[in-house]
Amino acid sequence: MTKEECFYLGKIVAKFSFKGEVLIKLDTDEPETYTEMESVLVEYNDNLVPFFIERSYLHKSTLLRAKFEDIETEEDAEDMIGAHVYLPLSMLPKLPEDKFYFHEIIGFNVIDAEHGNIGKIVSINDSTAQALFEIEKDGKQILIPMNDEFIEKVDKKNNTVRVITPEGLVELYLG
């Protein structure tokens, strides 16, 4: 299984006990959804390696305390710290029609209320305080905050996102 077929679930941030348990910092708004998993994919040397879970439960809200099969010692767990954890895309919970996962809208056309089609979403930048649509049009990049005030409608059937941008924002990029 490749990373493109998976979604990022979190990162192993610490060992927990001398029995090989680890703490996984979950990158989700609903960590309780992931307490009953049978296995996860852990990134090692650019490969995704399946690990079966013996037991897991939430620890301090967004941390998942997990015991993997074949990880028996503190030293084994130490080797896993910093590794990214993934699950197959098929395990993503279904969302209501008006909600979306970031990966679902890559390639969608963005239609602005004033300017019409302003390009395609090439990426989502979520490394800032406010996630941004990264849109490309004619070799130029446009950044639009992913804000409920700006997003009018996400149309998954027609692969479009309708936005109402503040005056001057699109002109800033397109001139």
UniProtKB/Swiss-Prot annotation:
It is found in: Cytoplasm. GO terms for molecular function: ribosome binding. Residues 97-169 form the PRC barrel domain. Keywords: Chaperone, Cytoplasm, Ribosome biogenesis, rRNA processing. It comes from the Bacteria. The keyword Metal-binding does not apply. Signal peptide: none annotated. Its main location: cytoplasm. One of its GO terms (biological process) is rRNA processing. HAMAP family: Ribosome_mat_RimM. Binds ribosomal protein uS19. An accessory protein needed during the final step in the assembly of 30S ribosomal subunit, possibly for assembly of the head region. Essential for efficient processing of 16S rRNA. May be needed both before and after RbfA during the maturation of 16S rRNA. It has affinity for free ribosomal 30S subunits but not for 70S ribosomes. PANTHER family: RIBOSOME MATURATION FACTOR RIMM. The PRC barrel domain binds ribosomal protein uS19. This is Ribosome maturation factor RimM. It comes from Christiangramia forsetii (strain DSM 17595 / CGMCC 1.15422 / KT0803) (Gramella forsetii).
